[in-house]
């Protein structure tokens, strides 16, 4: 999630990691 997809989504969602 976030800008790097660090949470596993691999998109622009979730916490910005």
Curated annotation (Swiss-Prot):
BP-aspect Gene Ontology terms: neuropeptide signaling pathway
Keyword Secreted: yes
GO molecular function, one term: neuropeptide hormone activity
InterPro entries: Pyrokinin_CS (IPR001484)
Expression by tissue: Expressed in abdominal perisympathetic organs and abdominal ganglia.
Originating organism: Pycnoscelus surinamensis
Family per record: Belongs to the pyrokinin family.
Name of the protein this chain belongs to: Pyrokinin-5b
Parts forming coiled coils: none
Modified residues (Leucine amide): 17
Protein task: Myoactive.
Cellular localization per UniProt: Secreted
GO terms under cellular component: extracellular region
Keyword annotations from UniProtKB, A to Z: Amidation, Neuropeptide, Secreted
